[in-house]
Amino acid sequence: MGEVRGAAREVRLRTVEDRDLDVFFGHQADPEAIEMAAFPARDRDQFAEHWARIRADDTAIQAAIVTDGAVAGNIMSWEQDGQRLLGYWVGREYWGRGIATEALAQFVGQVTARPIYAHVAVHNIGSIRVLEKCAFRRDRGQEEKAPPPEDGVEELIFVLDA
């Protein structure tokens, strides 16, 4: 995590708008964030296709994370292989301010389907802390069933049951 830059005054979730996608693209292209998330950046075309699929997916629930009037990131949940999954991405300039934690707390309050699973790179301590603060627990049983990572990056699996 980056240095603490002061707590955000307000965090809210809202519908993703077309204009948010440029902000999201910049977040996912940040080299430090890529390393932390252990997730490769997409080029513009791949990114546009990815978000077109998300927005067309009837199982996907997505929101823009807004703090102090600026788009700080995104959060979403979708069904895959019979599980409801969770993902979020917050711009590095917003790390360490409690924004991801507050956004996740709001999101899981609105998305009532359970269980919800989150996969996180073992070295992404900030994201692990966010999940734990929002009552997710590590699911070692799911980790044992998971195939070995194709990219060699060990993942932990967290679940919110209730």
Model-derived features: where do they sit?
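Acyl-donor (CoA/ACP) binding surface of acyl/acetyltransferases
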Residues: 1-22, 26-32, 36, 62-162
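Conserved GNAT-fold acetyl-CoA-binding loop/helix
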Residues: 32-52
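Short loop/turn motifs at secondary-structure junctions and domain boundaries
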Residues: 53-58
